[in-house]
Amino acid sequence: MEAQHNETEAAGKPAAKKTTRTRKPRASKQATFIAEAPAMPIAIKEPGQFGRVNILNCQPSVEDDVYAARVEIGEQFTVSAQVFMEGRTKVGATAVLKNPRGRIMARVPMTVENAGLDLYTAKLQAGEHSTLNPWDAEFAEVKKQLGNWRVAIEGWEDTYGAWLHDARIKVDVLSDVENTLTSGSELLTRWASTRDANLNAEQRKTLREAAKSMMDTSLDAKSRLTFADNADIEALHETNPLRDGLTSSGDHVFHVERPKSSFSAWYQFFPRSEGAYLDDNGKKVQGNFHTAVSGLERAKAEGFNIVYLPPIFPIGVTNRKGPDGALNAGPDDPGSPFGIGSELGGHDTVDPLLGTMDDFKAFCQRAHELNLEVALDFALQCSPDHPWVKEHPNWFRTKPDGSIAYAENPPKKYQDIYPIDFDNDLEGIEREVERIMNLWIDAGVTIFRVDNPHTKPVRFWQDVIAAVTKKHPEVLFLAEAFTRPAMVRALSYAGFTQSHCYFPWRNTKPQLEEFLQETNGKGGYYQHNTFWPTTPDILTAYVRDGGVAAHAIRAVLAALGSPSWGIYNGYELIENRQRADAEEQSSNEKFEIKVRDWSAANRIGISKLLTSLNEIRSKHAATTSYHNLTILPSANENIIAFARQTEGRFTKDGRTDTLIVVVNLDPYNEQQSSIHVDAKALGLPTEHPYRVKDQLTGREYDWSWDNFVSLAPWADVAHVFHVETGEQPLD
């Protein structure tokens, strides 16, 4: 029968790529070709029915394709499916990638991952990797590549492969030779004339001449077989196969998001602490948006690309909290920026102590000049002084005595915060939040970090994010939701681009191995975990007690364990004094202004390490994907090792990028271990050693299958090896 489908100009080859600047991608011409295959009345797969080839379990699938899997533009990702036919019939499979306009951008042959399970896989890349920012003029071309891409799996009977398998056996024992060779000659002739194979004139000529030579009875059988069994024909079989019984799955949607949706490096600081100092009387003088430029410059110097600010709105006076959340605030206590709203304004107003809206716009402009995006904390809650309390009393819950209920998480009480009640005027609250977010976007904000979104209805966030991104598709959302996995997953489905996660509490080797695989496995298609060693709300015992070594260990794990990571400023200064009653810093910056001596950072060395880690990330494509991490076996429970690898067809220079990360988890003692590397699985040399170069120290070693490491907290807490394969870069 006739099977119709679209072809690319170069079958099996993805569109051309580059890493930094992005040009308009070239799409192949779309044409309809007729597959001249034997009559197979069920070759086309109808919805709910099996085709001639059976295709099952197409992955990734998020909630049975109710929600789209998500990847960053240019990010390497893997698709898989079970493809099979009856009996011992050989099959082949192809992954077909289509852009939002339906054009086929790549047709990639799939490889057998598990023959017993009929499982085939292929690695794909949607669009071209870019480092452009939303304000760059060229970003318009990036935007054209964003949106819903589609992947279909094509299965087909591998007639040539099956014939060749049997022909080798029969010719070797001289069984039914003439019928076998005649069938092969006819197969090559049909292959040469099949338009589905998309052969050029030279390739068709090769097949026809081979078919003719196979019928030369003056030659012995083995010589005749070689005309169909050689490297040239095998190469055509890989790139331009004869595909009988062609069957296609339905399209599976992948939502392709803009740069930094997956691969990002965050730096958090409080503007009021930047440039703060003690006056002659020992009184703290807070910083503002002018002095906070120093935070931008520090973030840039250390290699971060997103600066994240806590709420910058007016702070309430009623029930204002004192140091470390004390119930009674003194006259000079600045209060928590999360107690939002005063007589000066609410979420749409700049705190006058920080400056004006024009000052904030100038701050954002300076950030953009430094190639830094500005992320703003959006905490949807109010102080008792917020204008909404008077303007929209139905947005809050009242107690039987008529008073408004403040926030509680027993035994904790937050008298300075009123939570929102969404059940009386959901649409009105949505419209107001959309208005406010658009206001800050116009001022220069491109990302919102949402505080405690899990305490609000998921549908609310789904509506708000959809409305905001419809107008501003470049805007990203980070969910600060330390809660149950189902809720975090739901928030991701609702549109949150990234998520805070439980990385700070994953400290042992088993915990980390499980969490790394969870983050970089199927979950990475809908939930982008961002690894933060500490935050203003989190200071674990591991970091508290482990000193400089613990800070270094956690930084390496965060930077290389996830494509997205973040640092809360002060990490460089080992600020690790913990409150007695909470797992967070004492003298917490949420409640007071910090005056810091940044000159100590160079002496401690963490700042230099952060810079090195971000430099490694910027140079190595292997660090950019949530779908390329492999745990490596190590013999010591205090040593963890993993590899990240991106294939050469997805890198700027065409060379496969492989990183091997080895970390000592013990911040007190030297640890030694053997590390096993499955060289074959990673495509590394199997018969001889290969060279690895430590990206932190520059030292080089010869590695192979099993390797010895020794790491000490007073020397190197980690190795970050780049495998020097000797591949030549593309011209």
UniProtKB/Swiss-Prot annotation:
SMART domains: Aamy. GO terms for molecular function: hexosyltransferase activity; hydrolase activity, hydrolyzing O-glycosyl compounds. Residues 1-10 have a biased composition (Basic and acidic residues). Residues 15-27 have a biased composition (Basic residues). Residues 1-31 are annotated as: Disordered. Alpha-maltose 1-phosphate binds at K321, Q381, D416, N452, K590, F591. Its EC number is 2.4.99.16. The record marks D537 as: Transition state stabilizer. It is an enzyme of class 2 (transferase). Transmembrane segments: none annotated. The active site is at D451, E480. One of its GO terms (biological process) is alpha-glucan biosynthetic process. InterPro entries: GlgE (IPR026585), GLGE_C (IPR049171), GlgE_dom_N/S (IPR021828), Glyco_hydro_13_cat_dom (IPR006047), Glyco_hydro_b (IPR013780), Glycoside_hydrolase_SF (IPR017853), Ig-like_fold (IPR013783). Coiled coil: none annotated. Keywords: Carbohydrate metabolism, Glycosyltransferase, Transferase. It catalyses: alpha-maltose 1-phosphate + [(1->4)-alpha-D-glucosyl](n) = [(1->4)-alpha-D-glucosyl](n+2) + phosphate. Homodimer. Belongs to the glycosyl hydrolase 13 family. GlgE subfamily. Maltosyltransferase that uses maltose 1-phosphate (M1P) as the sugar donor to elongate linear or branched alpha-(1->4)-glucans. Is involved in a branched alpha-glucan biosynthetic pathway from trehalose, together with TreS, Mak and GlgB. This is Alpha-1,4-glucan:maltose-1-phosphate maltosyltransferase. It comes from Bifidobacterium animalis subsp. lactis (strain Bl-04 / DGCC2908 / RB 4825 / SD5219).
